[in-house]
Amino acid sequence: RIRCYQMLDKLVREHIILGVDPGTLFMGYALLHTIGSKVEILDFGVYDVHKLDDQYARLQKEFFFLQEIIDKYHPTVLAIESQFVDKNPQTMIKIVHAQGVAIAAALSKDVPVVEYSPMKVKMAITGNGHADKHQVADMLQRFLHIPEKRMPKKLDATDALGIAYCHYLQLGMPQMQ
């Protein structure tokens, strides 16, 4: 599924990275298109299911939404945040359910999955594994030249963008301008 191109006597790879920040009420998603060392944002945002009362209906909506995104953009990989230990076990279980739904949606469309811990994402983007969400969003805005008016209000979207960008950096092809 990885596409390759001959450019300037070099073989370069093209990737479409789907980043997902799983959640039970809001799911962040982002799509990055990379060719060699070039990276551009195809789409990013938050899928909102908070108005549905039934937790399983929310998971079903997230599953179908991700399948639609996969059908539209044909990502070559799903990069998803691995779960951290939460103080509230019930919260953690619900988030793990959302993570499982995202992974199942990708695998049902033959999209491979990679996981990154929140600390790894923060370290890759800011150089500090304990950076806060606003610091990560600020760095992504700089690296990806996102105009202020396009920055989302909900940080779930920039979290997903950070996960996708972290995977891009792991490919060993960063171009920071």
Where are these regions (language model features)?
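Phosphate- and other anionic-substrate recognition elements at nucleic-acid/protein interfaces
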Residues: 1-177
